[in-house]
């Protein structure tokens, strides 16, 4: 039974004065809970919801819950995959209140005391709230009735499911591959290596990996299998591209001089100039910064192959250290540090000054708080225009407006994004314009290094701006090269430990929730001290920040990318939700150990399946994409790298109406859909026209055949008419009267004057029938039947045989000269003229015949 619908809106029940003081929203929320609603259901009585995915099970269900952000009542459900909020009555999913469990960063129980209660009351009533903070920039608050166990049930369900102790407790393992099967990513990595080496026609296979026959090479580089068992470097892929002149033994020696064994290897090579983009971790120069490795220096020097000019000069090498210089020096205490340009031939060391993972995590948290405080759907249920004494953007206090803008700047997120963009653009320019090689590293070479290298690849190679290439880029520079997705996302690893502190997911962070004066936290665990949480927490939105950088490039170069901003948002949602296994664990080695590709569904197959339904008109496809317009490197100037908030991601929860910033893109997509429909209609019309033309041609051919047959029949008819006229003249020359039968057939009756006794034909009835003779009932002294007979019938005619044997007018070779010979040919085309000679004796002659003869 659904909860009764409210008659009063939360925002309408309070006075304007209460809103001005900033406490009206909470008092409004309290009024609604005076209505009675059923308590949460037990697990055994859950409804069969249509919104559930494959293998998704309902664990906890609570009715009569309010989503404070939008003032909506409904049902809150905890499944083994999501926290789902369904609208009251219709049971439609409310997107803001529905969040995958893995996307939840933290949640906490909140208590709000009712300020409208009488002062003399002994006990002030309070209401129960649950705050949920997501990694996808949302902060939502759910309200529960007091004196019920709904909030406790939901809270305990989240507590059990948001932090699984084992990797295989994640929903992706329960669901399995389903219809989104995943091939082994090692095969795809080798195919990308083959493309980089100019061996794109070769295709990798698992048999090739098993027997080690994938070690191909070109003039400068080769694929090395020294790490095939992940012993040399557990966080590197099984195959590496290294200089062809470096042996496997030297590769192993060089790995000992780099942090975590992450030696310099090739990530991308220019197909024409030979310049490369390489990556590694920091060198282990020691406390005195005087440690060196001849093998490492040789390996780095081989990255600078000779230029293709006449002077055979060696190209320059840039060593790009992503860290601030002071951070690099601080790592000396732990044996790390940075290279000295004096030790590496023709090299230059450059520091980019990008902050560490902790700075990025705190920056995104501040940005999320800013958006929640100044968005249109706030987590305390009020509009940003009604906060802080009632000032508004249109006519409020300018100092307050400036303060809010300053808060956005204080978050530092856009500054960090610009740092990554600027560093990547600088790297791409060195490779494209100077034909120089660049070696990029940070401390461990898997966070800032992955950002810079992958973004520089995107700028340099148009292939990576397609759907297929973008997948290959992420699988190469993020997954294969060991970005620790489990630690950065707070998910369990192969060993079963989670990368986030045990208590962090259960507590409210300071400043993340704008609490009114009477609001208190009732979490079961005390929040950890800032120092301890900062040291232990390895979560950081590194990959999210890189996707943000890609969206900035997409904004600057709308014609250069095959995919759209909506594709990037869906990609991020899939990564954060852990619905698929592609981004599990911390390295390729761990994913191979668990068998992720066989046990879990594939994110890339899922996204491709979404696009297949609509083709190029799908929202993931960029309608402006023009591959010929940007078929080379993208080299943005520094002035163009000023980033902005990414509306489709940053504003979609706090400012839903403003998140649809791509109106032009949407209109273009609509026009593209219409054009596609018209194109299909045109193709259909052309197809029908071709079919009609074929039918017309066929009918024309039949008509021509009919005309030929008609012409032939007409010719035969004329010929027969001439022959008939000749026969008529021949008969009339005997002085006989010719009479045609009225039947219209080929039989012609010739009659003379009547006699008393009719004569019978000399032929028997059967003979007369065979030659077409018809006996008429009309009595006459002579009856002659004329019919047209076939040649085979004529051949059996005895008169014909007589004609053939006795005719004196035939040629020497036996040919007949009729009608030129002037004979009455019996076996001619006039065969069938049969005479009754007995009747001929009694033939009557017209009297006028003799008069004519005498006159002549």
Tell me what each language-model feature is:
Residues 2-7, 15-18, 69, 97, ...:
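Conserved N-terminal structural segment that caps and organizes enzyme catalytic cores in eukaryotes
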Residues 50-129, 133-135, 139-145:
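Phosphoinositide-binding peripheral membrane targeting modules
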Residues 278, 431, 436-458, 550:
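A phosphate-binding catalytic loop at a beta-strand-loop-alpha-helix junction
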């Amino acid at each position: 039974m659904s909860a009764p619908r409210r008659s009063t809106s939360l925002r309408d029940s309070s006075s304007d004065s209460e809103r001005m003081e900033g406490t009206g929203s909470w008092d409004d929320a309290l009024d609604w809970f005076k209505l009675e609603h059923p308590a949460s259901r037990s697990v055994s009585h859950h409804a069969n919801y249509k919104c559930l995915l494959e293998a998704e099970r309902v664990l906890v269900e609570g009715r009569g819950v309010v989503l404070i952000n939008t003032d909506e009542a409904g049902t809150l459900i905890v499944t083994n995959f999501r926290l789902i909020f369904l609208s009251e009555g219709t049971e439609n999913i409310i997107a803001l209140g529905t969040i995958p469990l893995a996307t939840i960063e933290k949640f906490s129980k909140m208590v709000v005391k009712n300020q409208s209660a009488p002062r003399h009351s002994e006990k002030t009533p309070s209401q129960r709230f649950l705050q949920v903070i997501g990694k996808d920039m949302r902060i939502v608050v759910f309200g529960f009735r007091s004196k019920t166990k709904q909030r406790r049930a939901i809270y305990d369900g989240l507590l059990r499911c948001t932090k699984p102790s084992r990797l295989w407790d994640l929903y992706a393992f329960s669901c399995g591959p389903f219809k989104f099967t995943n091939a082994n990513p090692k095969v795809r990595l080798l195919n990308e290596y083959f493309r980089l080496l100019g061996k794109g026609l070769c295709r990798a296979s698992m048999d090739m990996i098993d027997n080690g026959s994938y070690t191909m090479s070109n003039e400068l580089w080769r694929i090395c299998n020294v790490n095939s068992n992940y012993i040399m470097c557990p966080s590197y892929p099984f195959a590496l591209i290294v200089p062809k002149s470096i042996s496997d033994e030297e590769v192993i020696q060089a790995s000992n001089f780099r942090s975590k064994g992450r030696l310099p290897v090739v990530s991308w090579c220019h197909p024409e100039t030979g310049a490369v983009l390489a990556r590694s971790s920091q060198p282990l120069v020691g406390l005195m910064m005087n440690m060196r490795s001849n093998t490492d220096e040789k390996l780095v020097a081989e990255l600078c192959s000779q230029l293709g000019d006449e002077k055979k000069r060696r190209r320059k090498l840039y060593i790009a250290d992503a860290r601030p210089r002071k951070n690099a020096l601080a790592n000396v205490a732990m044996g790390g540090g940075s290279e000295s340009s004096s030790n590496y031939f023709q090299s230059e060391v450059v520091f980019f000054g990008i902050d560490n993972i902790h700075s990025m995590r705190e920056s995104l948290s501040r940005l999320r708080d800013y958006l929640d405080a100044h968005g249109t759907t706030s987590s305390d249920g009020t509009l940003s225009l009604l906060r802080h004494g009632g000032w508004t953007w249109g006519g409020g206090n300018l100092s307050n407006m400036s303060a809010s803008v300053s808060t956005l700047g204080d978050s530092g997120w856009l500054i960090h994004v610009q740092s990554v963009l600027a560093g990547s653009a600088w790297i791409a320019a060195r490779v494209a314009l100077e034909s120089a090689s660049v070696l990029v590293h940070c401390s461990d070479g898997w966070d800032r290094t992955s950002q810079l290298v992958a973004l520089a690849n995107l700028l340099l190679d148009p292939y990576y701006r397609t759907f297929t290439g973008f997948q290959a880029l992420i699988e190469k520079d993020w997954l294969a090269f060991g970005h620790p997705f489990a630690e950065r996302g707070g998910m369990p690893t192969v060993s079963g430990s989670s990368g986030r502190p045990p208590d962090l997911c259960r507590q409210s962070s300071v400043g993340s929730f704008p609490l009114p004066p009477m609001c208190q936290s009732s979490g079961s665990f005390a929040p950890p001290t800032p120092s301890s949480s900062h040291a232990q927490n390895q979560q950081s939105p590194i990959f999210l920040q890189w996707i943000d950088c890609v969206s900035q490039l997409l904004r600057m170069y709308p014609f250069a990318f095959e995919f759209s901003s909506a594709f990037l948002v869906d990609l991020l949602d899939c990564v954060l939700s852990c619905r698929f296994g592609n981004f599990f664990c911390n390295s390729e080695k761990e994913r191979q150990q668990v068998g992720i590709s066989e046990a879990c569904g594939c994110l890339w197959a899922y996204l491709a399946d979404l696009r297949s339904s609509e083709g190029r008109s799908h929202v993931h496809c960029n309608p402006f994409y023009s591959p010929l317009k940007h078929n080379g490197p993208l080299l943005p100037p520094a002035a163009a790298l000023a980033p902005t908030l990414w509306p489709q991601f940053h504003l979609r929860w706090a400012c839903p109406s403003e998140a649809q910033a791509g109106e032009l893109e949407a209109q273009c997509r609509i026009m593209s859909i219409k054009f596609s429909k018209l194109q299909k209609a045109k193709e259909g019309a052309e197809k029908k026209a071709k079919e009609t033309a074929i039918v017309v041609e066929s009918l024309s051919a039949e008509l021509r055949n009919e005309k030929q047959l008609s012409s032939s029949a007409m010719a035969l008819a004329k010929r027969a008419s001439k022959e008939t006229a000749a026969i008529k003249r021949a008969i009339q020359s005997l002085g006989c009267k010719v009479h045609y039968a009225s039947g219209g057939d080929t039989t012609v009756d010739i009659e003379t004057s009547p006699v008393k006794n009719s004569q019978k034909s000399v032929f028997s009835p059967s003979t007369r029938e065979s030659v077409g003779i018809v006996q008429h009932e009309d009595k006459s002294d002579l009856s002659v039947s004329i019919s047209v007979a076939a040649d085979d019938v004529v051949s059996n005619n005895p008169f014909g045989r007589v004609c053939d044997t006795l005719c004196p007018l035939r040629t020497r070779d036996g040919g007949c000269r009729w009608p030129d010979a002037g004979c009455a040919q019996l076996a001619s085309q006039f065969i069938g003229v049969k005479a009754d000679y007995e009747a001929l004796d009694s033939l009557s002659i017209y009297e006028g015949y003799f008069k004519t003869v005498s006159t002549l």
